[in-house]
Amino acid sequence: ANIVFDVESATTGTYSTFLTSF
């Protein structure tokens, strides 16, 4: 996942994965 959205990944892994897709 993105480092900036690392905190978001801890809460919702799906959100982090979605940003990584782009």
From Swiss-Prot:
The entry's keywords: Golgi apparatus, Hydrolase, Plant defense, Protein synthesis inhibitor, Secreted, Toxin, Vacuole
Swiss-Prot/TrEMBL GO biological process terms: defense response; negative regulation of translation
Source taxonomy: Eukaryota, Viridiplantae, Streptophyta, Embryophyta, Tracheophyta
GO molecular function annotations of the record: rRNA N-glycosylase activity; toxin activity
Primary residence: secreted
E.C. number: 3.2.2.22
CC annotations in GO: extracellular region; Golgi apparatus; vacuole
Organism: Phytolacca dioica (Bella sombra tree)
Disulfide bonds: none
Job of this protein: Nicks pBR322 dsDNA. Has adenine polynucleotide glycosidase activity on herring sperm ssDNA.
Protein name: Dioicin-1
Similarity remark: Belongs to the ribosome-inactivating protein family. Type 1 RIP subfamily.
Enzyme class: hydrolase
Catalytic activity: Endohydrolysis of the N-glycosidic bond at one specific adenosine on the 28S rRNA
Compartmental location: Secreted, Extracellular space; Golgi apparatus; Vacuole
